[in-house]
């Protein structure tokens, strides 16, 4: 098969000159950051990415669809960048003087609506398999690399092996690594305030308590709304885990079919490799699960080991927040607080399908309830009743100005907004030579 004869685009191979230029730019940088996108997974380049990241020795941020590329405890992992990212990841990007992005198209979700302010002090090296993505007006790309991510990373690894001794890293800037590590420690997504209210439970507290109890290598599939956003914000990622979402499409109802697909694929993989099969975790919401509710019977019929954690926030919480932020009362088409629609009682639906059922209605009950659900042999539904007033945070947001106008704040300035002096202190790194 010859793609050129079919008039198909042939992706160019990465040249030695390109690789050497990238290495030299990283070597010269004072505040480099590696932005790791989901194209790395798609290219089958996960293993080589991990080796290259270790050899480069620069802080790593992940994107909206790629949070499982690096575990939270990895020394180089800084955070999650973008308008649904965290503070530490965005502080690193916004203070960087070089951004090396691999396998990410750097969509508006990654660069924000105030895209001229994105990584404005950085020399941007961007890799993507689609040449058109490198030309978008919402980006400044000083060194475009049109290539397959695996080809780029394999050639980088080969060149780094030639240039570096065993155990040596390319970037020698310990101070910058320590600064990024401190941001990660000082600005966690899940905070003590999320545990203060006892009942109902807080969704951020739930996400942390659930995810920290999972095993290395375990697979989580999430629905949309709170499951995707809060999960993407606050999930504790461990080594070898997968976090699967359809965030770019964001259609409700993805959760159950995707969890079934992940379960079947995982069974086949474990059979072929001899690895121990683990339960699949499905985190979804009271709105999303209704879109493909019939798949509960598929799970029961085949006794697929899927643990369903159902976030009950009384309706469509993403829409609730949008209406409250921009329009106010009365709310329309939300759930309990709009009064014009409602959802069935899962305590009655679950046994009708044959599921064991657990309900958690307070922060104090999170640990016991989650552990009970995880310990049950086979499928289970664990419903978590959460606060309807909890907003997604931190999050890119419009900022009110003194004249009453609204402007999109840059990525370093996520809502809830930090005190001005604190933010200035954090951003001082961007002006250092």
Residues covered by each model-derived region:
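Short glycine-rich anion-binding loops that position phosphate/pyrophosphate groups of nucleotides
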Residues: 38-40, 65-67, 104-107, 225-227, ...
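A short, gly/pro- and small-residue-rich
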Residues: 51-56, 111-131, 240-241, 394-410
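Short internal beta-strands
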Residues: 58-64, 125-128, 306-312
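Glycine-rich, acidic loop regions that bind phosphate or pyrophosphate groups
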Residues: 66-179, 370, 374
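Thiamine diphosphate
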Residues: 83, 95, 134-137, 144-146, ...
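Active-site diphosphate/adenylate-binding microenvironment
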Residues: 179-273
């Amino acid at each position: 098969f010859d793609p050129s004869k079919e008039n198909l685009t042939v992706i160019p191979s990465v040249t030695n000159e390109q690789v050497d230029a990238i290495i030299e730019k990283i070597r010269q940088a004072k505040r480099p950051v590696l932005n790791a996108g989901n194209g790395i997974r798609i290219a089958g380049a996960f293993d080589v990415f991990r080796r290259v990241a270790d050899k480069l020795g620069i802080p790593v941020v992940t994107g909206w669809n790629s949070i499982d590329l690096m575990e939270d405890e990895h020394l180089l992992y800084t955070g999650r960048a973008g308008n649904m990212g965290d503070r530490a990841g965005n502080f690193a990007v916004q203070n960087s003087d070089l951004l090396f992005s691999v396998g990410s198209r750097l969509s508006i979700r990654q660069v924000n609506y105030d895209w001229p302010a994105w990584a404005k002090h950085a020399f941007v090296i961007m890799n993507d398999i689609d040449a058109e993505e490198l030309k978008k007006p919402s980006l400044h790309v000083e060194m475009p690399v049109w290539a397959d991510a695996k080809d780029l990373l394999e050639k980088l690894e080969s060149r780094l092996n030639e240039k570096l001794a065993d155990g040596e890293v390319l970037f020698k800037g310990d101070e910058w690594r320590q600064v990024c590590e401190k941001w990660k420690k000082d600005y966690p997504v899940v905070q003590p305030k999320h545990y203060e209210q006892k009942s109902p439970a807080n969704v951020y507290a739930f996400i942390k308590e659930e995810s920290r109890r999972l095993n290395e290598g375990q697979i989580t599939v999430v629905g949309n709304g709170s499951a995707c956003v809060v999960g993407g914000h606050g999930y504790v990622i461990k080594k070898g885990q997968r976090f699967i979402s359809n965030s770019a499409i964001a259609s409700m109802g993805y959760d159950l079919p995707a969890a079934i697909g992940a379960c079947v694929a995982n069974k086949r993989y474990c059979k072929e490799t001899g690895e121990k099969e683990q339960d699949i975790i499905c985190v979804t919401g009271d709105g999303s699960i209704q879109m493909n509710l019939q798949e509960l019977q598929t799970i029961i019929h085949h006794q697929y080991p899927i643990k369903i954690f159902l976030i009950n926030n009384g309706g469509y919480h993403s829409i609730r927040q949008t209406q409250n932020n921009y329009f106010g009362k009365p709310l329309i088409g939300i759930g309990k607080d709009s009064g014009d629609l409602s959802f069935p009682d899962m305590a009655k639906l679950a046994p009708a399908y044959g599921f064991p059922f657990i309900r958690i209605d307070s922060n104090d009950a999170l640990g016991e309830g989650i552990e009970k659900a995880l310990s049950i042999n086979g499928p289970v539904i664990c419903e978590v009743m959460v606060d309807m007033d909890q907003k997604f945070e931190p999050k890119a947001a419009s900022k009110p100005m003194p004249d009453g106008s609204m402007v999109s704040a840059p990525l370093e300035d996520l809502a809830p907004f930090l005190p001005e002096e604190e933010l200035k202190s954090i951003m001082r790194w961007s002006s250092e030579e």
